[in-house]
């Protein structure tokens, strides 16, 4: 059985996994796809969904997933250029001859196993790691030469533990300190936080916030300086579904505004939802770099649930399917004239 604790003084909901998933306001992508397609019994696994997906695949014939591309004008500026970059920890190479460019408007998912070099690459981009070979330019400059205001106005990094960036004793003090450090107008960070997390109270100690709230506060602190490049290290670790959905919206808005974004993540569903490009690292080397669909579908390890259900066609998310054939699905579920309507 599954017990759902909805919060807001609402009663518990107890039932079998299928009963709970059919009614739950949030659910894994494979369940959302089953609900959208009207499958019964509702599949709870990719294997069961593939068995039920034949009619849905037929409906998708002749349709193509939405193109994930950046605005040509936004993508003209190179925010990061790495050329044959090598980074070592002692004698051990952490990055080996890495070459890549990140432009404004891109959302790049940096993926790979633990120890592949993802966090090391983010650290090199902000100047925390010296190169043992090759070069890296952030905003056209060697990031290790950037200090203080020059650094925060060029690039922002949200680490795996966002709380590490938060030092004040209240949220309000944190916002004031961020305004001061960024040289921003008074109230800038607080205004950003209201947009990102309107339920956060200014008198709260940052350590008393949830992990999701700490992440959004850290994001507001970094965005106060308006850096064109934003880096996030495992941003969905510990987040619940609603906060993760909010983060996806925020990242899309930032990309549309021209920010370049790189996410180091194991979250294939996040990459499927928001990334325009995926870079895969293995033992410090880039082994794949291309559009999200091309990269994640070619590897079972990185394929999201919807891609596994609808393979070999390049559908990545439930929202992709809905945007293509949503009206057809609604008509197919509509009652006929002979059906009883409740």
Question: Residue locations for each model-derived region?
Answer:
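Conserved ABC ATPase "signature" C-loop
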Residues: 8-9, 284
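Conserved ABC transporter NBD signature motif
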Residues: 134-142, 151
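Helix-to-loop junction immediately C-terminal to a conserved catalytic motif
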Residues: 126
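ABC ATPase nucleotide-binding domains
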Residues: 14-75, 302-342
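A short, surface-exposed alpha-helical micro-motif characterized by mixed small hydrophobic
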Residues: 271-273
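Conserved ABC ATPase "signature" region
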Residues: 184-202
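H-loop/switch region of ABC-family ATPase nucleotide-binding domains
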Residues: 265-266
């Amino acid at each position: 059985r599954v017990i759902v604790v909805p919060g807001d003084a609402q009663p518990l909901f107890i039932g079998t996994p299928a009963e709970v998933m059919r009614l739950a306001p949030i659910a894994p992508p494979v369940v959302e796809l089953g609900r959208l397609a009207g499958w019964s019994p509702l599949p709870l696994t990719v294997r069961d969904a593939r068995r039920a997906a034949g009619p849905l695949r037929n409906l998708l014939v002749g349709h193509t997933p939405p193109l994930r591309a950046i605005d040509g004008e936004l993508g003209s500026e190179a925010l990061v250029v790495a050329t044959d970059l090598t980074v070592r920890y002692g004698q051990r190479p952490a990055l080996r001859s890495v070459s890549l460019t990140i432009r404004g408007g891109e959302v790049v998912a940096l993926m790979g196993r633990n120890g592949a070099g993802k966090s090391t690459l983010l650290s090199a981009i902000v100047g925390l790691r010296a190169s043992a070979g090759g070069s890296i330019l952030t905003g056209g400059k060697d990031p290790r030469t950037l200090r203080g205001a020059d650094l925060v106005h060029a690039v922002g990094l949200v680490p795996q533990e966002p709380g590490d960036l938060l030092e004040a004793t209240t949220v309000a003090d944190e916002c004031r300190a961020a305004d001061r450090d960024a040289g921003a107008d008074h109230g800038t960070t607080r205004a950003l936080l209201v947009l990102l997390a309107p339920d956060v109270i200014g008198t709260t100690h940052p350590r008393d916030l949830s992990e999701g709230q700490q992440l959004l506060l850290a994001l507001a602190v970094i965005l106060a300086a308006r850096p064109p490049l934003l880096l996030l290290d495992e941003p969905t670790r510990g987040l619940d579904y609603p906060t993760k959905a909010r983060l996806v919206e925020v990242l899309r808005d930032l990309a549309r505004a021209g920010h370049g974004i790189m996410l180091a993540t194991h979250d294939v569903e996040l990459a499927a939802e928001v990334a325009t490009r995926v870079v895969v690292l293995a033992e410090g080397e880039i082994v794949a770099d291309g559009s999200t669909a091309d990269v994640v579908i070619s590897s079972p390890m990185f394929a999201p649930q919807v891609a596994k259900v609808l393979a070999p066609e390049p559908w990545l998310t439930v929202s992709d399917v809905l945007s293509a054939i949503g009206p057809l699905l609604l008509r197919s579920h509509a009652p006929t004239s002979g059906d009883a309507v409740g």
